[in-house]
Design a protein with these regions (language model features):
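Predominantly extracellular/luminal regions of secreted and cell-surface proteins
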Residues: 121-155
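Short, surface-exposed beta-strand/loop "edge" segments at domain boundaries and coil↔beta transitions
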Residues: 70, 141-142, 184, 260
Length: 281
């Protein structure tokens, strides 16, 4: 694995994700090799329970990596993913693994979140594959990455390097073009909280809509409560209507914190907010 990491040229860092290495040290051929070696190791100590448990516990990072990479794929073997998720949950409970990462997220909570967040939903988002026009563009490299990431149907993970689009020290705004007028009932934007990376939930989100892309009608303004926990969290900010709204364009305006607050160790420095997915139904 060390040789594969060096050969890939992909660096490791504190807020890394297995997804960063899906084409390097965690590419399919190497993952098959790692699993084969663990299969052999488990077989070799099958008659010795204490040693078997050690091998099974050592295998957990590979199992976690498989799950993380699988959720980023557009084509999924759902039976296989559910089987792996069930086994991972069974093992972390058996070995009483307390945390998943440096931010104390629970691995049992991760399994629950995985089923709710990353497994395909019955109702598809109307925003899937829609055109996104930025009124206040994302920061730096995220401007290019943001062309598709907000409407690709794939939710980001617990680190911002994975599918998230960020704005630093500013507000954000964009318009989603559904291509034609459609009846919609709700819009929801997904945000990331990771204070160790100076990523905070925004202060406010405003939704509006228009059939012509020019004359917008206010839908809803949502103020977000402050979040100070060290755990990585996700928050969906949603506007709903009891009656269908016929529209083609949906505008999302986000008011960011812009600076780290007084209680944060980065006080006075620019803060971020990150969005991954916008869901319209």
């Amino acid at each position: 694995m060390e040789g594969a990491l060096i050969g890939s040229g992909q660096r490791l860092w504190i807020y890394d994700s297995p997804v960063s290495h899906k084409y390097g040290m965690l590419k399919p051929a190497l993952m098959r090799r790692y699993n084969h070696l663990f299969d052999l190791a488990e077989k070799a100590v099958a008659a010795e329970p204490d040693f078997l448990k050690r091998v099974q516990r050592a295998r957990l990072p590979i199992q976690y990596s498989e799950l993380e990479i699988a959720r980023t794929e557009t084509e999924k073997d759902l039976v296989d993913i559910n089987k792996k998720l069930d086994l991972f949950e069974e093992r972390v409970k058996e070995f009483q693994v307390p945390t998943l990462n440096e931010r104390s997220n629970s691995p049992v909570d991760y399994c629950k979140l995985y089923r709710e967040r990353y497994m395909p939903q019955k109702e598809k988002s109307l925003a899937l594959g829609a055109k996104v026009t930025y009124l206040i563009p994302p920061t730096g490299k995220y401007a290019a990455l943001g062309k598709n990431a907000l409407v690709d149907g794939l939710f980001g993970g617990a680190t911002f390097v994975d599918s998230w689009i960020g704005w630093e020290g500013t507000d954000g705004a964009f318009v989603i073009d559904l291509g034609e007028a459609k009846e919609i009932h709700s819009v929801e934007t997904d945000f990331l909280h990771q204070i160790g990376a100076w990523i905070l939930f925004p202060l406010k989100v405003v939704y509006s809509y228009a059939e012509d892309g020019e004359h917008y009608t206010h839908w809803k303004t949502i103020d977000l409560p402050e979040e100070r926990t060290g755990e990585v969290k996700f928050r969906g900010v949603k506007a709903e209507s009891a009656e269908p709204i016929k529209t083609r364009y949906v505008k999302v305006e986000v008011t960011g914190t812009k600076e780290c607050p007084t209680w944060h160790y980065g006080v006075g420095h620019p803060s971020w907010f990150f969005i991954d997915e916008v869901i319209i139904k």
